[in-house]
């Protein structure tokens, strides 16, 4: 099987992203070289795994985190940095499928997720450039009217008072572009530097006694009353409980999860610091943006006045050679005034989606669990997911069961057939975007 941990990035190195230029990369933490026993073992030192470790420590549990590469190496340290509201489905769709009572649970958990992000930042004094405000930007009038309906529903039915509708004139004035027809501003959402955030969580976890091993790849798991994990170096871990939190990089450590979660790649560029007079209103407001395309554009400005712009996906294992130019073309459609701006950074990352885009919480066995598949909505949801896992282990909450009972169906066909099927499906939606 192709190893997604190594196919697109040099082994043991962070990608050369804008985010890595903003932090001081620490020395590699020790890899596991001896056999150990632990209460709880967590595979993956990303947002989910570190949130789980910190939440477990809060409840008096000890955990060990095994990271195949570097702390925050995957999507956790590469994403667009948006701390969004709600789930991947809007509330109307959740109500249609599950009824209002369950839709309310989804909403309350998502609201708690944002609060948990803010709480971790404040509690651990993580300097990650957090700022409030995310704009849902719509590419046509139909999407704009739909966004207004969503805003009304959230305000009236869920008492969410943080939304401000934007017409074409209003959104154009804020974003310094005529590309979008309207949308809304969500002041209850926000954005941050994800690598600073995840590294801050890692530092906090180590401070409270969590043992984190980097460059420690698990190659085999024997599930049972106790879990036996074997690493590529031959070290063995025996744990009472196990959490698989590798998301798009999990591979076949649990084939049932792998059949329900599809790794896909997404790409981001960052310009040179913008010249005086460019995007002045956008700089002043300092909001993040996600638009209404099926494969959305998402962007925001950095503290040093670069435009960080995400655009484009691919559905094969390897990043395409031209992804920088693909993302740049998408940026120029939104901001033609930046056609002569240099692109200083470009990077890709692998996230994980499910068929219905709801997160995949699974009971692998009586003592092993997996959480993955945030489908591009994971900065806040991964943090609450880790907390939910910790509460479940401590028998303080049934919310893990709430998510584990969601209908997350396997992708059709064996793994070798899923990629071409996914490509065909995504190409159809991409073509649909072009004619909207």
What are the residue ranges of the model-derived segments?
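N-terminal Rossmann-like FAD-binding beta1-loop-alpha1 element of flavoenzymes
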Residues: 36-65
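Dinucleotide-binding Rossmann-like beta1-alpha1 core, especially the glycine-rich loop
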Residues: 87-169
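Helical element adjacent to the flavin cofactor pocket in flavoenzyme catalytic cores
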Residues: 153, 178-240
């Amino acid at each position: 099987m192709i190893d997604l941990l190594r196919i697109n990035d040099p082994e043991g190195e962070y990608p050369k992203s804008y985010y890595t230029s903003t932090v001081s990369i620490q020395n590699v933490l020790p890899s596991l070289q001896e056999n150990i026993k632990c209460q709880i073992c967590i595979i993956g030192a990303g947002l989910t795994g570190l949130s789980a470790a910190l939440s477990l420590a809060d409840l008096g549990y000890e955990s060990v985190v095994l990271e195949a590469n570097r702390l925050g190496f995957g999507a956790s340290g590469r994403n667009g940095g948006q701390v969004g509201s709600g789930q991947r489905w809007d509330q109307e769709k959740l109500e249609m499928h599950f009824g209002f009572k369950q839709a309310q649970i989804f909403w309350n958990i998502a609201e708690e997720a944002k609060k948990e992000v803010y709480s971790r930042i404040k509690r651990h004094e993580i300097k990650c450039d957090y700022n409030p405000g995310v704009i849902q930007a719509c590419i046509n009038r139909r999407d704009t009217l739909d966004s207004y309906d969503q805003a009304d529903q959230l305000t009236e039915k869920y008492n969410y008072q943080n939304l401000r509708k934007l017409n074409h004139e209003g959104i154009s004035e804020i974003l310094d572009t005529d590309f979008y027809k309207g949308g809304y501003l969500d002041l209850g959402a926000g954005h941050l530097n994800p690598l600073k955030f995840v590294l801050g969580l890692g530092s906090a976890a180590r401070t409270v006694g969590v043992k984190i091993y980097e460059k420690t790849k698990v190659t085999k798991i024997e599930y049972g009353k106790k879990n036996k994990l074997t690493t590529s170096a031959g070290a063995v871990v025996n744990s009472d409980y196990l959490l698989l939190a590798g998301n798009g990089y999990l591979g076949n450590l649990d084939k049932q999860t792998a059949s329900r979660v599809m790794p896909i790649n997404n790409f981001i560029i960052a310009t040179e610091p913008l010249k005086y007079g460019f995007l002045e209103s956008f700089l002043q407001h300092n909001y993040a943006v996600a638009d209404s395309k099926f494969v959305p554009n998402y962007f925001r400005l950095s503290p040093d006045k670069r435009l960080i712009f995400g655009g484009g996906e691919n559905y094969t294992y390897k990043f395409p050679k031209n992804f920088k130019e693909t993302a740049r073309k998408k940026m120029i459609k939104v901001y033609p005034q930046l056609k002569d701006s240099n692109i200083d950074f470009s990077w890709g990352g692998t996230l994980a989606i499910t068929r219905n885009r709801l997160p995949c919480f699974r009971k692998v066995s009586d003592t092993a669990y997996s959480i993955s598949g945030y489908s591009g909505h994971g900065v806040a949801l991964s943090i609450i997911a880790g907390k939910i896992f910790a509460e479940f282990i401590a028998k303080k909450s049934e919310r893990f069961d709430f998510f584990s009972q969601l209908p997350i169906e396997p992708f059709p066909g064996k793994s070798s057939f899923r990629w071409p099927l996914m490509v065909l499906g995504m190409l159809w939606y991409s073509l649909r975007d072009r004619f909207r």
